[in-house]
């Protein structure tokens, strides 16, 4: 029997409501993710992708509807009370790690986040160090041999891969990836996406990954959703997704929305 890890029901969110600048960001969004679902999210600027992730994380309170993460109704909870349920990686590789601290120190902080700290506990225990080394091997970036290196010495791709790993150390109910490869060059982005697949697959993590690249959205995950004007207009999975091409996706968008997809909104290749 499958386990529901995320349930979004009829969620609405507007910015500047009742003014001439009113913007409907989420317009009745419904989405359910089961344990292990890896869902890629595509859509143009202003489609509602990041607003949806912010609503899940509690950054923006929603106007109506409900959100459940695992068994917890988080609809009215502030972000800090949802933090233990969520792992999140943002677009900027510099924001997820402390540059002046060592790799193992960053990982130790992520592992102990939200837990009571003992003044007698060493910075990083031998057991933690060995665990970190094994986890870093999964990334295949050689970081397992550089545990005491300052994070500021790493490349942007290495830092983003490390941030990804840190976001999963406490086994969150859901992992939110908000265009986490957008600031990287194509070759580095490919490496980070490969690392993402490994980390998500190893721990069977339930994941929502926003991407601005249609090919990446098609190539990764077991489901693809497309958003437009605050709505989920496509939800493609299984064999249909496995056979999907960029041309198919553009055609489906046009059929559902009644308009052509503006190619400047995302990368088609």
Predicted segments, located by residue:
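A short, flexible loop at the N-terminus of ABC-type nucleotide-binding domains that lies
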Residues: 2-5, 14-28, 78
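ABC ATPase NBD coupling module
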Residues: 19, 73-87, 95, 118-125, ...
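The feature captures the beta-strand-to-loop junction immediately N-terminal to the Walker
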Residues: 42-44
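Helix-to-loop junction immediately C-terminal to a conserved catalytic motif
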Residues: 57
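Conserved ABC transporter NBD signature motif
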Residues: 65-73, 234-236
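ABC ATPase C-loop
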Residues: 167-168
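H-loop/switch region of ABC-family ATPase nucleotide-binding domains
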Residues: 211-212
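Conserved beta-strand-loop-alpha-helix hinge in the C-terminal portion
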Residues: 231-257
């Amino acid at each position: 029997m499958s386990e529901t890890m995320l349930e979004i029901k009829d969620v609405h969110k507007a910015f500047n409501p009742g003014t001439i600048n009113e913007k409907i960001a989420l317009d009745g969004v419904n989405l359910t993710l089961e344990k292990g679902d890896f869902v890629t999210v595509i859509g143009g600027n202003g489609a509602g992708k990041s607003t949806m992730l912010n609503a899940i994380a509690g950054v923006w309170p929603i106007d109506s509807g409900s959100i459940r993460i695992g068994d917890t109704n988080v609809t009215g909870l502030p972000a800090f009370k949802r933090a233990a349920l969520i792992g999140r990686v943002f677009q900027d590789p510099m924001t997820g790690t402390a540059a002046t601290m060592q790799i193992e120190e960053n990982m130790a902080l992520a592992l102990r986040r939200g837990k009571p700290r003992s003044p007698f506990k060493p910075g990083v225990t031998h057991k933690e160090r060995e665990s970190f080394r094994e986890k870093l091997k999964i990334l295949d970036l050689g970081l397992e041999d550089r545990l005491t290196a300052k994070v500021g010495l790493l490349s942007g791709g290495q830092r983003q891969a490390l941030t990804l790993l840190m976001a999963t150390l406490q086994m969150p109910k859901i992992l939110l990836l908000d265009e986490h490869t957008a600031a990287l060059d194509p070759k580095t982005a490919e490496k980070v996406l490969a690392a993402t697949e490994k980390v998500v697959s190893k721990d069977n993590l339930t994941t929502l990954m926003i991407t601005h690249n249609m090919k990446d959205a098609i190539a990764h995950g077991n489901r693809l959703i497309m958003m437009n004007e605050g709505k989920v207009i496509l939800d493609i999975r299984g064999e249909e997704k496995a056979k999907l091409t960029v041309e198919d996706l553009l055609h489906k968008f046009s059929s559902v929305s009644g308009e052509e997809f503006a190619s400047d909104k995302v990368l088609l290749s």
